[in-house]
Amino acid sequence: CPLLFTWLEQVQANNKNGEIYLTDIVELATQAGSKVACQIADEAEIAGVNDRADLAYLEAVLQTRLRNSAMQQGASLIAPETVFLNADTIIGQDVIIEPHVVIGPGTQIGEGSIIKSFSHIEGSKLGACCVIGPYARLRAGTDAGDGVKIGNFVETKKSTIGAGSKANHLTYIGDSVIGADVNVGAGTITCNYDGFGKFKTIIEDEASIGSNTALVAPVKIGAGAIIGAGSTITADVPNDAIATTRSALDVRQNAAIRYRNQRYEPS
């Protein structure tokens, strides 16, 4: 409408906020003798954002819509008001999301997966029937295959994790490629940063990493290899090998009694 541009030039910022309101065109059109019609819209669709309170209100509206859409498409949100989604989140059929979960941009969750409470996921792709959390953090670049388990207080970043693999507790997996059916024991750390650059850890199919292990990248653990608990691995381990770096156990009989006597001996 050519007249629209004419009226736009006449709109003034003569209101308490000093803003230009497009809706002032209605008054100008009426004054010019034009016929004016209106369509009733959802209030939230045309609401303005003048402060952080307005922004929070509209964010809540958006979150409600995203939650409802996810549930209508087959996901179960146990306490919907506590789950936060992103506009581009893709959630498969029969996914269960427990309370207090945050899903950031670029996340895809495969069908039948379970996201347990207090987990944070962003920039990640999960296959079918994964179990995540509680208290898990999946950072950008995480790509988990079908049936992967990432448990409590586990953090992943820029890592591919093969089908059926699991890291159930207290683990950091960064810049890694993990094969299928790998077990990563509690307290395992992929030491990917030397203060200057990031390096890759590779763990091949069916390897088993013992608890409290440090894998100093770049390093490769071969298929079927076993890493003993408490080891620090700084070199590649061949397929089906067992690698340990623990010191020998030193047991001193009755030494605890002598130690206590020395500590509490009157001066």
Task: For the regions a language model picked out, list residue spans one by one.
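Acidic, glycine-rich loop-and-beta core segments that form the ion-binding/anion-interacting portion
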Residues: 78-150
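Glycine-rich hexapeptide-repeat left-handed beta-helix
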Residues: 131-267
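Catalytic-core segments of class I nucleotidyltransferases/pyrophosphorylases
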Residues: 1-63
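Hydrophobic alpha-helical scaffolding
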Residues: 15-16, 45-48, 84, 171-172, ...
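Long, charged amphipathic helices and adjacent flexible linkers at domain junctions
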Residues: 59-88, 259-262
